[in-house]
Curated annotation (Swiss-Prot):
GO MF entry, a single one: gamma-glutamyl-gamma-aminobutyrate hydrolase activity
GO biological process: polyamine catabolic process
Coiled coil spans: none
Protein name stated in the entry: Putative glutamine amidotransferase-like protein YvdE
PROSITE patterns, A to Z: GATASE_TYPE_1
CDD domains: GATase1_2 (cd01745)
Organism: Lactococcus lactis subsp. lactis (strain IL1403) (Streptococcus lactis)
UniProt KW keywords: Glutamine amidotransferase, Transferase
Length: 236
């Protein structure tokens, strides 16, 4: 059994907050459910002072970076684009420091959506701040289609950590930022039909990340469940 540390998503917008004006750190229940279904324990790690990170890491075996706000373009040397969404510099700093500490402690990391993007930036890569900067014709922000429904195809490298996926696989999609330049030491292991990166890995450092949201589909798509299984069971 592994103890999985999921970095919490800060909810800082108190106006019309469902939490009665309280700031909170939360994660999707589906992240908790999939790991518990696989027999593992989950701890939600709140965004906190960076000096507390090493203490948090003593409590967990692995780290999960989830979705949420856009990654600040200042982290990769760009000014904000007009179509940049909400950013959270405090979360950015905390999660980047957590990535650094987790790598130093040899703790495996799984990134989902924003988590993939932030890992890419950590390793020196850059992002497209908005899909309008690309030539993609795929609807990567699939709303109002429900999140449980896969909507576009990806091609998967069969010699990668995701080699158990069909070579031509369908995923859901809820993002408007994507990788532009790949970070040093990272390998792109899945692409959309538009050529955009959909998954990355660094085998040496036990890093795996996907652009889609397998936590939304694991109950109906057994291949998506297996992503969490191989991560939790230590096969990446």
């Amino acid at each position: 059994m592994a103890i999985i540390g999921i970095l919490g998503t800060p909810y800082n917008t108190v106006e019309q907050s469902p939490f009665w004006w309280n700031k909170v750190s939360y994660t999707r229940q589906s992240f908790i459910d999939v790991f518990q279904d696989l027999g593992h324990t989950v701890i939600i790690l709140p965004v906190d002072k960076t000096e507390n990170i090493k203490n948090y890491l003593t409590l967990v075996d692995k780290i999960v970076l989830t979705g949420g706000a856009d990654v600040s373009p200042y982290l990769y040397g760009e000014e904000p684009n007009a179509k940049l969404g909400t950013t959270d510099p405090i979360r950015d700093r905390f999660e980047l420091a957590t990535i650094k500490a987790a790598l130093e402690a040899n703790k495996p990391i799984l990134g989902v959506c924003r988590g993939l993007q932030l890992l890419n930036v950590y390793f020196g890569g850059r992002l497209y701040q908005d899909l309008s900067q690309t030539s993609s014709q795929i609807k990567h922000l699939q709303s109002p289609t429900p999140q449980e429904i896969p909507t576009h195809h990806i091609s998967v490298e069969q010699e990668s950590a995701l080699g158990f996926l069909p070579e031509n696989y369908m995923v859901n999609s809820f993002h408007h930022q994507v990788i532009k330049d790949l970070g040093q030491g990272l390998t792109a292991i899945a692409h959309g039909n538009d050529g955009l990166v959909e998954a990355i890995e660094n085998k040496e450092k036990h890093v795996l990340a996907v652009q889609w949201h397998p936590e939304c589909t694991w109950e109906t798509e057994h291949f998506d469940k297996k992503i969490f299984e191989i991560f939790a069971n230590g096969t990446i």
